[in-house]
């Protein structure tokens, strides 16, 4: 696999993380520090790279079992997180219980949900016998960079437009989950 192909693959895999990070940045409001941007982007990048490695090591032997339910895991996680964001957006402006993209549990859930495709890609890379270190590190670094941009962009955009960004973000997460489910059920 040529490096440009690896780069394009990494960009494609990071699009779900971009959507999540834009939403996270919008929710952060005045708490969008460099450290928080790095935290969100790092978790999303590490999960993308890590799931690629896990998928690669599982290889061909487990492909049929993983592919049977990976889309349900991603759908369920994104539906839950999106639903929570929508629910929180309808409540009064209290800070307790609001969607918090810095909460470790929420961030890990988002990391898993947005990197399920990387698991399948890892399995495919094992089939192709592609060099794992190059693939996984490129996927992780690209996802980190795109996610960092997403958090920053979401924060700047969210400050200029006073919308219910929790509601929009929740709908985006549910949309991503639904897209993953439909693709796997009807187009794979």
UniProtKB/Swiss-Prot annotation:
Source species, domain of life: Bacteria
InterPro entries tied to this protein: Mntp/YtaF (IPR003810), Put_MntP (IPR022929)
UniProt GO cellular component terms: plasma membrane
Main localization (coarse): membrane
Record's keyword terms, sorted: Cell inner membrane, Cell membrane, Ion transport, Manganese, Membrane, Transmembrane, Transmembrane helix, Transport
Compartments (UniProt record): Cell inner membrane
MF term (GO), any: manganese ion transmembrane transporter activity
Membrane-traversing stretches: 2-22, 40-60, 66-86, 107-127, 133-153, 167-187
Membrane topology: Multi-pass membrane protein
Task of the protein: Probably functions as a manganese efflux pump.
Stated family: Belongs to the MntP (TC 9.B.29) family.
Protein name: Putative manganese efflux pump MntP
Organism: Parabacteroides distasonis (strain ATCC 8503 / DSM 20701 / CIP 104284 / JCM 5825 / NCTC 11152)
């Amino acid at each position: 696999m040529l490096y440009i192909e690896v780069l394009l693959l990494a960009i494609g895999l990071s699009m779900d993380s971009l959507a999540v990070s834009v939403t996270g940045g919008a929710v952060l409001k005045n708490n969008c520090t460099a450290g928080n941007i790095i935290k969100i982007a790092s978790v999303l990048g590490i999960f993308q790279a890590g799931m690629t490695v896990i998928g690669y090591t599982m290889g061909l032997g487990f492909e049929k079992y993983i592919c049977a339910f990976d889309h349900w895991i991603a759908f369920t996680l994104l539906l839950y997180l999106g639903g929570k964001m929508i629910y929180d957006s309808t409540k009064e402006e209290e800070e307790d219980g609001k969607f918090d993209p810095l909460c470790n549990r929420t961030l890990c859930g988002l990391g898993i949900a947005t990197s399920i495709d990387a698991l399948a890609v890892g399995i495919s890379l094992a089939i192709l016998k592609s060099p794992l270190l190059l693939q996984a590190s490129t996927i992780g670094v690209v996802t980190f960079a795109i996610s960092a941009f997403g958090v920053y962009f979401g924060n700047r955009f969210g400050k200029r437009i006073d919308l219910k960004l929790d509601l929009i973000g929740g709908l985006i997460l549910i949309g991503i989950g639904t897209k993953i489910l439909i693709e796997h059920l009807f187009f794979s």
